[in-house]
Amino acid sequence: MTYLQESSRPAVTVPKLQAMRDAGEKIAMLTCYDASFAALLDRSGVDVLLIGDSLGNVLQGHTTTLPVSLDDIAYHTACVARAQPRALIIADLPFGTYGTPAEAFASAVKLMRAGAQMIKLEGGEWLAETIRFLVERAVPVCAHVGLTPQSVHAFGGFKVQGKTEAGAAQLLRDARAVEDAGAQLVVLEAVPTLVASEVTHMLKIPTIGIGAGTDCSGQVLVLHDMLGIFPGKRPRFVKDFMQGQPTIQAAVEAYVRAVKDSSFPGPEHSF
């Protein structure tokens, strides 16, 4: 069996994401952890495949992402890359792997050698030096602000961020800082719609929302969540796209269409 497929779709690159944002075309991102799903998501029109540390929850059964190791992410990144998707491949830097700029670079090198084309890391102003260090060394960076799951214990749980005036101001500072440091993409998670909209209009780089309203440049969901196969309480920002669909591919195509035409997320998925 081979996962390689002929595709006339142009490869999605980091500059392509910027061009999509500038043209007003929404970016559809999903998490992905293996070659089979990488091929399926790619032919369904997904623009970005994220090897997220969410694999700690949906694959390994942990209650947080903290136990996920760099080797775990590298393994699943290599699995996804073997499908040779046209979609851009982004890999998460796990908890405890980017405490210093030098450590972050060493971790990023391992993931890029495994097949990642961009790395994602969680944090705002305090990460500016690290982001700048990576970008100067040819590592494309996606920042992640708002609710950062690796900070679950510091936050006291999975809570919406930026709800207060002070919190919103900090989120704006974080977003500006990561852009100024050279990040080419930023994920906004569990952020009030109005705040996410302000961030999106303030920045020149694309924003990817998850529980951040419809004004972001694109959307991301955890694959298992959007297919309705992850047990337990479903976050407000999740929609089960498998409902009413005959196949997984049809569900993914429905997700892509909903992101592209801005029918997802709706008010019921936002804060």
From Swiss-Prot:
Its EC number is 2.1.2.11. One of its GO terms (molecular function) is 3-methyl-2-oxobutanoate hydroxymethyltransferase activity. Binds 1 Mg(2+) ion per subunit. Pathway: Cofactor biosynthesis; (R)-pantothenate biosynthesis; (R)-pantoate from 3-methyl-2-oxobutanoate: step 1/2. It catalyses: 3-methyl-2-oxobutanoate + (6R)-5,10-methylene-5,6,7,8-tetrahydrofolate + H2O = 2-dehydropantoate + (6S)-5,6,7,8-tetrahydrofolate. Its cofactor is Mg(2+). One of its GO terms (cellular component) is cytoplasm. CDD domains: KPHMT-like (cd06557). Mg(2+) binds at residues 53, 92, 122. Pfam families: Pantoate_transf. GO terms for biological process: pantothenate biosynthetic process. NCBIfam families: panB, PRK00311.1. HAMAP family: PanB. This is 3-methyl-2-oxobutanoate hydroxymethyltransferase 1. The gene is panB1.
